[in-house]
């Protein structure tokens, strides 16, 4: 009889041969930078958190600094900013709609895909770290799915994926530009509509939303000049606003002039809007100025600082308690009265000389400052916002004396929020449009008027819109 084959003998453990655990080895979790980015993406999805607000807190709490902090910032802001493009690539590589993928897995895939397409991270490291985290969060099956998708993505560069997935430029030029620049198509279309005859600038306008915005400071009039502030912070005097200084680097919160209230952090476009109201031609200015949508108080502070020189006093209206408190803090020592109230029903006595309506809006003009905001807003948001804007502008006009000026402003170029709202006011209320362009001198390239539309790619500011209206005597 043929003897049975030898079976491997199991050795008893000895002191020299320790027995191995039957449990699989614990996978190494994500490094601190990737972990922070992953946690922020989950918080955005689950709690509607804002990446630009949450990430600095996490970095500080976890002691992440230097290169790790820079990497976490790049992953978080970058993957948030180009989410639409990443999802299109992920969907193609996975052969399924991104919406059908587990949301946590999709967050991981976005981080991995961003590293593969937009960074110099080694492809193997980008894939392996993401797969390992998928195994920790789920199981080997899900980790295998992540591995397969990322390996497919890693076989091609971004341009190759864009060439395959972007709409045909000759058929849908707006859709093509929106895909390439990672914007929702409706946002790109709103830029085209606002650019009008300059629609050929669409790509430049979209690209500017991906540029890191330079920090702008405003020197407080009557206290500090722009030249003095620039010298103190080693910055450059602004191109347009007489108060503006461009900060090349560093944390503005650490600047002594900012801490002391002698300067504030404010985009140059916002400075120009506040200044424009004070430059509007007005007979017999009695010094009653109103900021109807004041929170958090940046424009109010600049208005009030200018008001000091003319003997005017500013009333600031803000409905939200915490934002009204910020107005109080930001205008300390200035001639400002803060009223917590809805701007549509303030209870104030009419007769204001100059009124600013910096209305709540979609914020499409400041997409470069908030990495995920282009994906937060939807076209369905527009009707409610424009209704609020019309009501606020109507209230402002009612509070303005005959011969007084209202300056309506938004940080959005969307025509429904700009000329649509202003046009409605011109039809319904006793106002006429002034040529707003002279109020923004020395800014050039402002078009045919009578309104002003700033653009990041032209002026280096947020895309602020402004319209000056003169109230008639009825």
Where are these regions (language model features)?
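S-adenosylmethionine
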Residues: 1-474
């Amino acid at each position: 009889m043929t003897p049975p084959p030898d079976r491997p003998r199991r050795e008893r453990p000895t002191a020299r041969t320790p027995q191995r655990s039957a449990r699989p080895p614990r996978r190494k979790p994500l490094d601190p930078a990737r972990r922070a980015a992953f946690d922020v993406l989950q918080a955005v999805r689950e709690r509607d958190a804002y990446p630009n607000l949450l990430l600095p807190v996490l970095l500080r709490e976890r002691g992440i600094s230097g290169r790790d902090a820079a990497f976490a910032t790049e992953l978080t802001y970058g993957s948030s900013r180009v989410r639409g493009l990443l999802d299109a690539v992920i969907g193609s590589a996975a052969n399924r709609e991104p919406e059908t993928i587990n949301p946590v897995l999709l967050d991981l895939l976005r981080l991995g895909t961003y590293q593969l397409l937009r960074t110099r991270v080694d492809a193997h490291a980008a894939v392996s770290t993401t797969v390992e985290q998928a195994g920790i969060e789920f199981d080997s099956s899900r980790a295998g799915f992540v591995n397969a998708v990322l390996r497919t993505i890693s076989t091609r560069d971004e341009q190759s994926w864009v060439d395959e997935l972007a709409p045909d430029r000759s058929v849908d030029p707006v859709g093509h530009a929106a895909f390439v620049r990672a914007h929702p198509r409706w946002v790109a279309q709103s830029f085209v509509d606002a650019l009008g005859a300059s629609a050929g600038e669409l790509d430049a306008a979209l690209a500017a939303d991906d540029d890191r915005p330079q920090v702008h400071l405003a020197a407080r009039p009557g206290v500090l000049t722009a030249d003095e502030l620039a010298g103190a912070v080693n910055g450059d005097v602004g191109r347009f606003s007489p108060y503006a200084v461009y900060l090349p680097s560093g944390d503005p919160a650490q600047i002594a002039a900012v801490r002391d209230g002698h300067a504030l952090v404010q985009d140059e476009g916002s400075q120009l809007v506040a200044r424009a109201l004070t430059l509007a031609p007005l007979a017999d200015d009695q010094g009653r100025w109103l900021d109807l949508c004041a929170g958090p108080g940046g424009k109010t502070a600049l208005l009030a600082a200018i008001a000091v020189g003319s003997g005017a006093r500013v009333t600031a209206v803000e409905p939200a308690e915490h934002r009204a408190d910020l107005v109080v803090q930001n205008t300390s020592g200035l001639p400002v009265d803060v009223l917590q109230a809805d701007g549509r029903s303030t209870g104030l006595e009419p007769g204001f000389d100059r009124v600013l309506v910096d209305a709540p809006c979609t914020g499409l003009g400041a997409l470069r400052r908030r990495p995920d905001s282009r994906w937060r807003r939807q076209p369905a948001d527009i009707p409610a916002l424009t209704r609020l804007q019309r009501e606020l502008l109507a209230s402002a006009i009612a509070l303005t004396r005959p011969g007084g000026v209202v300056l309506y402003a938004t940080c959005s170029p969307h025509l429904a929020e700009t000329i649509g709202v202003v046009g409605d006011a011109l039809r319904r209320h006793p106002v006429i449009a002034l040529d707003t362009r002279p109020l923004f001198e020395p800014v050039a390239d402002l078009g045919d008027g009578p309104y002003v539309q700033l653009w990041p790619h032209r002026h280096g500011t947020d895309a602020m819109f402004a319209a000056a209206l003169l109230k008639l005597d009825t």
